[in-house]
Amino acid sequence: MKLFILIILSICLALVNSQQGVYPDSGVYVSLNSNFLATFGNEFTQTIQNQINSYPVANVDGKTGKVSYSVTNIQQSVQLGDFFFQQTGVNTYNIGWNSVTFTITTDYQGCYKIGGLKKLSICEKGDIKINSQATLSLSIAMTIDFTQSTPTISCSSTTLNVPANGINYNVHCSSKVCDKTHDITNEIASKFVPSVESGMTTEINNNVGKYLSLFPSLRDMNMEYNGNEFYLDSRGTIVESSQGGVLTPTMVLAMNGGIVVKNSAGQFIYPTQSPSSLPSEEAVEDFQTDIAVTLTPYLFESLVDAMFESALPMTITPSEVPSESPVHLNTSDPFFNQTAPGLTGKYPNSPIDVEIISPSSSSQTMVSINSTGVLVGLHSIPVNFIVNDETVFQILFNFNIELTPALSQSSNGISVTGTLDKLDALVTVGSTSVGDIDVSGFVQLIELAQGLVKIPTITIQNPLTTYSLSDLSLSIGDQYIQILGNLQQQQQQQQKQKQILIK
């Protein structure tokens, strides 16, 4: 029984916090196709059935009323079919099988005392057979919540649906004295179903803690910068698709999808913005591959802001500029002599420190996705030019960036990067104490540096760790990027590779 419960839990973890057909704004949607889930359900059912039927059940000793009993040599044969799952409400769902048949056989011995002083023991022994006479169904009601940093899972009830006369209880006594056969039969008949239901519920709740770590609230993106680590906020909900009439509907894991920074002090810094776009229902539900991963602008917006959080403020000193650079941080450098002549006149031949400051929260990164690619808008990035510890002028940079996304497969998931197609810069003067500033020089400088821009890579970990991804493709829709692929159990894949090598 315990093994049966543990295996059930493994599938329960993939079906959390359902709310049929209602999708929240998120950064990442991971959709599993109905056909894949049906195949998975069949394989899962066969695995459970084999495990149950081969599981050695320990002997049971106990006492009921005046009868002490011993149940030995327990054998079971269970057949499961029509695996299903369904959303029943916010954070609640049912999982089970619409077809359950079984046969259980045991040997038993029951002993009781008789006589005036109860000193004479009478023992009866024989065998018990419990079997289904009709098709039963098993339904497990779960409450699972992964919306917070600490997930919770619990089983509220287990129901074995039995039609009238659906189970036959047969106790056969092989002793010469068989006074308690009728009592034993009635006892089993009255307690079998309730004990199965309560036992499964208890075992599930006793073991759910082992599986909470399979759905972490933060997933490591294997990215580090400037002593900071990057994580994907994977809190969210699983939504049952709007399609009806199937036992295993397409399921969509809607994750927050924001990029969280863990700084060198161990503090976690979450995005200041929230998801604000929602793909169409068709985008996350209607696909032919096993899995679809849909990325929205929020993921990329929070990534850029996370990079700002990690890198800024940043100060560049004259000694950090390479000797071969076309511009040097000195007030008498030709570049500054042309763009800020008042600076050269007021502070001749003086070193310049450049301080780049993170944009204010009111100047959030804006990302848009359409058929041409990914458009990134970075607004009002302040850059201070400092001479003798005094800010002599400030420049505000606004960037419009066009990217073409590119897809690659990593060892632990999917990696998305991009190629820079276009970088437009709008430069304005924030403040100055050295007269006019010719901002066109800074625009030209940005154009020269365009080839040095590196686009960070986003890695989305494969949420199904026992499956590998194949046949990956990328497409762009209205405010989303979608990655399609198929899933294969790693053990099966290894067997196929071995067969190819043998041939």
From Swiss-Prot:
SUPFAM superfamilies according to UniProt: Bactericidal permeability-increasing protein, BPI
Protein's cellular compartments: Secreted
Cited InterPro entries: Bactericidal_perm-incr_a/b_dom (IPR017943), BPI/LBP/Plunc (IPR032942), Lipid-bd_serum_glycop_C (IPR001124)
Key words of the record: Glycoprotein, Secreted, Signal
Superkingdom of source: Eukaryota
Residues in the signal sequence: 1-18
Gene Ontology biological-process entries: defense response to Gram-negative bacterium
Family per similarity comment: Belongs to the UPF0522 family.
Glycosylation (residues): N330, N337, N370
Protein known as: UPF0522 protein C
Transmembrane intervals: none
GO MF entries: lipid binding
Pfam families: LBP_BPI_CETP_C
GO CC entries: extracellular region
